[in-house]
Structure formats: C-alpha cells, structure tokens
Amino acid sequence: MKLWTYLLYPSLLACLSLQSQSPMPSVRGSCDTLCNCEEKDGIMIINCEEKGINKLSQISVPPSRPFHLSLLNNGLTMLHTNDFSGLTNALSIHLGFNNIADIETGAFNGLGLLKQLHINHNSLEILKEDTFHGLENLEFLQADNNFITIIEPSAFSKLNRLKVLILNDNAIESLPPNIFRFVPLTHLDLRGNQLQTLPYVGFLEHIGRILDLQLEDNKWACNCELLQLKNWLENMPPQSIIGDVICYSPPPFKGSVLSRLKKESFCPTPPVYEEHEDPSGSLLAITSSTSDSRLSSKNTSILKQPTKAPGLIPYLTKPSTQLPVPYCPIPCNCKVLSPSGLLIHCQERNIESLSDLQPPPHNPRKLILAGNIIHTLMKSDLTDYFTLEMLHLGNNRIEVLEEGSFMNLTRLQKLYLNGNHLTKLNKGMFLGLHSLEYLYLEYNAVKEILPGTFNPMPKLKVLYLNNNLLQVLPAHIFLGIPLTRVNLKTNQFTHLPVSNILDDLDFLIQIDLEDNPWDCSCDLVGLQQWIHKLGKGTMTDDILCTSPGHLDKKELKALNSDLLCPGLVNNPSMPTQTTYVIVTSPTVAADTASTLFSSLTDAVPLSVLILGLLIVFITIVFCAAGIVVFVLHRRRRYKKKKVEEQLRDNSPVHLQYSMYGHKTTHHTTERPSSSLYEQHMVSPMVHVYRSPSFGPKHLEEVEERNDKEGNDAKHLQRSLLERENHSPLTGSNMKYKTTDQSTDFISFQDASLLYRNILEKERELQQLGITEYLRKNLAQLQPEVEVNYPGAHEELKLMETLMYSRPRKVLVEQTKNEYFELKANLHAEPDYLEVLEQQT
C-alpha cells in the first residue's frame, strides 16, 4: 500500500501543477515570464527587447488579441520557415539590431494582418523573390543598415499595399527593372547606397505616386545616362520632397547638385533611348555599372539588339566570371564581391580576438564580426586589413579600444561598434579613419565624450549615439564635422545647449532627441527656439518634458517660452553673457545682434513680424508726408506774410499791435521826410466809418454847437491847414483846396467840439498815446482864413478814423516838432482791409 502511495504521489503533484500552469500561457503568454506587456486602446504591446532571445519559439503571445511585438537587440541570426506561425494577430514586428543574415522562404507565413515590419540593422545581403511571401497587407517595410547588394526582380511584387520602403545605408548598386510595377509607393529612401543611375523606363515610370524620395549619398555618375532622372525630377510636383542628387563622378562635376547643372554641360549630345523587349514583354532598362559591378551567384542574361536580321532577337547567355576563391580564415565564411574585394562572415563564432583569424585573408572588403565575445581591440589586430570598407564589431563585449586601433583603415567607410561595453570615447580611438562616413555607437554604456573625439573623421555623416548614458556633450564636439544624421535618443540629457553644440550642425537633415529626461525650465528655452528653426521632417519625434511635474509629458515645441521660464523676457535687468560680449568684441557683437534678431523671429511668428514691420513702414511714410505738407504750408504762410509786410512798408500808415496786454509805450523814431512822396506814391484815401459812439444823434448836437461857435471853427481850421502845409507829410509842390471836401467825411466845425470828443474818448485812447499829444499841440494851432488845402479831408478822415474807431492796442510813434504822424506796422486785419478797400 505504501508502495502505491509513493508511486502515485509524484504523478498527482505533476497533474496538479500542469492544471495550475496550463491556463497562464493561453491568457498572458510570455508577458509574465520573459517580456513586458501593456494594453493600450485594446491592443497589446509586447516588449521583448534585450532579452537574449535567439529563437522565436521562445515567444508565446495571448490568443485572439492584436499586438505589437518588439524583439530589438536580441540574438536572432536566421528566420526559419513558419517561425511566425503562432503570431497570426501581430500588427507590427520589430526585429532591428539583431544579427539576422538570412530569411528562409515562408518565414512570414501566417502574418496576414501585419502592417509594419522592421528588419533594420541586421546582416542581410540579398532580398529574394519569396522573402516577403505571406505579407499581403504590409504597408511599411524598414530594411536599412544591412548589407543588401542584390534585390531580385520580384522581391516586392506581392506587396500590393506597400507605401513606405526604407532601404538606406546598404550596398545596392542597381535595381532590377519593373521592381515597383505593382507597388503603390509614396515614400522611398535610397540614401547611402552605390547607385549610379535611375532610368525612366522600368523604374521612374512606376513611382508616379511618390511623395518623398531620398537619393542622397550615392555614387551618381553625371553623364548622359542620368539625363532621364534630371528630366523626371524637373517635372515632379512642387509638394513632393525629393533629395538632392549630388554627382560623384566624373571629377569635373564631383560635388555638384544635378538640378543645378545644365544639360549641355554633362551631356552635350543626348542619347537616343531604345526599348528592348524580351519575350515576356518586360523592358530591360536597368543595368549595373560596368566599372564597379558586383557579380551575383547566378548567371546574368544580357540582351542585345541585333544589327542584322531585325526579325530575330537572339539571347546571348554569358556566364559569370569564375573568380578564384581566396583563403578564408576558419571558422568564417567568405564570398567574393568583385575581382578586388572579399566579404568575410564571422558572426556568432565565439571569437575572442582578431588574432584568431590568422593568417588574414587577402584584400578583404567587408569584415563582419558581430555577435562574438571580443573584449579588447588591440592596435595590431587590424594592421593587415587596410583594404576594408566596412567593419562590423557590433554585439560583442568590447570595453577597451587601444589608441590607434584603426590607424591603417584609411579606406573604411562604415564602422559598427553598437552593443558593446564602451563607457568613454576619446580622440585616440578613431585615429586613421579619414574616410569614415557612418559610425554606430548605440547600445553601449557611454557616459563621457572627450573634446575633439570626432575630429579624426572629417567626412563623418551619420552618427548613432542612442541608448547610452550621456548627460552632457563637450563644446564644439561637432565643429567641422559634416553630420547629416545624429541620433541622441534614450540617453540622460536634461538639457542640451544650442550654442557651440547644436548650432555647429550645419548640414543636419535628421536628428533624434526623444526619450530623454528633459527638464523643461529656462535651460531649455534655447533648444525650443532651435527646434522651431528646423525644417519639416528634421525631428523624427516629439520631445516630451519629464520635469517639472506640471509639464510632465508635455510637448516641448508646443509650450510657450514664458511657461518654460517665467519672467525671462520681461526682466531687462537680468545680466546676460551677450551684454558683456557686445562691449568687448565687434565681431561677436554682430553675432549677438543676429542671435537677438533670430530670437525675435522665434518668439514672434514671421507673418506677424512682417505685418508689424509693414505697419511701421506705412506709419513712417505718412508721418514724413505730414511733415512735408506742414513745411510747405509754413512756407506758403511765410511768403504770404512777406507780401503783406511789403504792402505795409509801402503804406504811410503803420499800425503795430502790442504783443502783451499791458499799456503800450511810446517810441520815437526818425522817419524820412518825404521819401514816399518823392517816389510818387499816392496817399491812401481813408474813409472814416461812423462808429456807434459818433453816430447821427451826436451829429445833431454838433450842428447846434456849430451855430454858436462857427466863427471860432473857421479860424481853427485855417490854422490847422496852414500847419499841415508845413507838415512832413506834404511835399513842397502839393496844393490843397478846402473846397474839395467831401460830404462823406465829418469835418471839424468847432474847436471845442473837437476837444470835447477827445475827452470823451480819452479812456479808450489811452493806449494810443494820442490824447496828451493833442492837448499839447492843438492849442498852438493859429487858424488862418482862405487857405487852399485840396487834400485836407484825407488827413482829417485819417485823424477821425484813429480817434473815433475802436482802439486796437496800437503803438503810435510821435515826434516833438511835427504834426502827429502814424508810423506803426498794421496787423489789425479788419481795419487794415477797410483801409485797403477805400484806397482802391
């Protein structure tokens, strides 16, 4: 009985454990054991990055749930048939940064729902016709940074929904004809390959829907074969984004942009393109360059048009040249790329040192040592590899790079050091890499980069530093380096200065800064303004704030500057570095002024700034016009005033108003005796209009008094006329008659009447200073009878005008020995106009 108990007890425990564990994989899969999972919008996101996975069978996913799967930076080397058969609900799969060198036929079977596939940063060399079988709904394919040299003609023929294809940074020299005939591409990236030409027939004619085409960093041969591409680019719609085609050869055009070259300069006699048809009706139009071609493992069929018997189209099959296979070090695999190059595959071979590869192969072109256990790279390890163009040391355990380890690699263009244990970078590590264009340092533990680290690489274009531990960068670290793509994401940056770091990236096309713990404070204002200056598509993703708490997960670009740093703009007393630079250096002052102007344009939208400047300009124009009108008006008034003054100067009567309200003072001046009359000037006729104080009623009283004192008046009048005859106002040749006296004027018929009227008007005439004058001088008048005084009425009318009209604050100049004479400049418009009218 005990024996049966001992036998059944383990079996019972095993059954219970299976029953308790069997439901878990069906519900959670690898989420509880191997991977990290989260659900978002009903879709599972399964993160299996850096888990050491080398077989897809290690992955199990929840059933009947759509999901995104990330297998970044694992140890996958090959994709076998039906490897993804258990992942039928996958929407996207990321296989980047592995060591995948081959994909078997049917590897993607069962992925009918897959929309995105990432196989970038692997070791693929060829894309076969059936590589992507089973991906009928694929829309996005990323295969950059591999070693792809060959793409077979029907590799993409089944991808009828593919819109985005990324093939940059491979070694593609040519594309087969009609490769995209049935592919509705809108975005195509072919940067960093070996392309020399792209013909219209068989290629350009099938990408008419393209919106974004990147063609930089290829070996374009600017000759007549490139004329079709130039014509096609010129006819593209303006909304399309087309990268620059920069000539690589011939030497006279190296570095020139194709779009700026004239057709006659690189193709004096345009060729006549003929279409050659094969029996299947396809056009053979794209061929690789004969000067730098790679030979595939298959035979190449060359089609020639016959010069005789045009009815026959013979096919000449030329076998590929059999090159002697050079020595290949064990345990590596070698492949001949061309008569002058060798590709050496040594990945995943447990190699600890390059000294194990002895003797070194002859004339190696590419050396792949990814996925080994190399700890140290010695200076002597690569001495015999001076012909290398690509060196892959990714996913090793390299901690030390001796100074000068790459000294002999003067031809090296691509260097992969990703996935190692490097902690510090310095200048000595990269000595000798004068031709290097691509440097991959991601997924290390780099904490410090010393100044001048990248100076030995004057041609460096692509730099990957993502997924490290960087917090700061030294000043001028990118100065003089023609970088076009920089990846700094997933580091420890809280802020990144623009001055002396980011503003040295003069050739920048793309930069990655996301997934850093950005502190959205005053230190990030400059970075925000710099981001606003970047062109569309330069930033691959948005920068999100981590601190302070109220700005967590806020997009930096969308924040206002005053929210990042309150009071920064409105605090003029805050000392800044530019304040001191302006005083000390004129050169830096100009840079500071441009910086201030650029800051202004960043803070204010350009459209608003232009509108404001336009308003200011219009305001200035109107102000200037107003000033001109005012000046002209003043000039006209001045001229008019001069004319009036001339008229006053020509008149014997001068009245001048006092400028003040006080009593006027009397000024005595000398006046020429008869200058006016010697110039034959006619004395004005002054009509005395009866004022209210001397009207008809007053005249009746005067007549009554005249009856009593008539005789005295006659004597007084004669005396006045006699003295007037000797007055300076009259010339010696003038004769007057009293009989010419007009009835319109009021005459003096009684001396007492004259004095009485003067006394009544004395208060009003005090400002004129005439009363005292009359009291002193009229008593001395001796009347004479029978004096002929023909102009006496003019003088009398003038006297009556001055005495009986309303006083105007007039300055009257008088002399002691003469009959009173008026010498004042007239400024009283109503009286003066009346005088002029009567004179006329």
Curated annotation (Swiss-Prot):
Q: Where in the cell is it found?
A: Cell membrane
Query: Which InterPro entries does this chain map to?
Result: Cys-rich_flank_reg_C, Leu-rich_rpt, Leu-rich_rpt_typical-subtyp, LRR_dom_sf
**Biased composition, Polar residues: where in the chain?**
727-736
Q: What biological-process terms (Gene Ontology) are attached?
A: adult locomotory behavior; auditory behavior; auditory receptor cell morphogenesis; axonogenesis; camera-type eye development; cochlea development; inner ear morphogenesis; innervation
UniProt xrefs under Gene3D superfamilies: Ribonuclease Inhibitor (3.80.10.10)
Which body tissues produce this protein? In the embryo, expressed in otic cyst, lateral trunk epidermis and underlying mesodermal tissue, limb bud, maxillary process, cochlea, retina, tongue, tooth primordium, central nervous system, and primordia of visceral organs including lung, gastrointestinal tract and pancreas. In the central nervous system, expressed primarily in dorsal thalamus, cerebellum and medulla.
Task: Extract the ranges annotated as region (Disordered).
Answer: 717-736
Which sections of the protein are LRR repeats? 89-110, 113-134, 137-158, 161-182, 184-205, 363-384, 387-408, 411-432, 435-456, 459-480, 482-503
* LRRNT domain boundaries: 22-67, 319-360
Topology check: give the Cytoplasmic ranges: 631-840
* Signal peptide extent: 1-18
> In this UniProt entry, which residues form the Extracellular topological domain(s)?
23-609
Compositional bias (Basic and acidic residues) = 717-726
Similarity comment: Belongs to the SLITRK family.
Name under which the protein is recorded: SLIT and NTRK-like protein 6
Organism from which the protein derives: Mus musculus
Lineage here is:
Eukaryota, Metazoa, Chordata, Craniata, Vertebrata
Protein encoded by which gene: Slitrk6
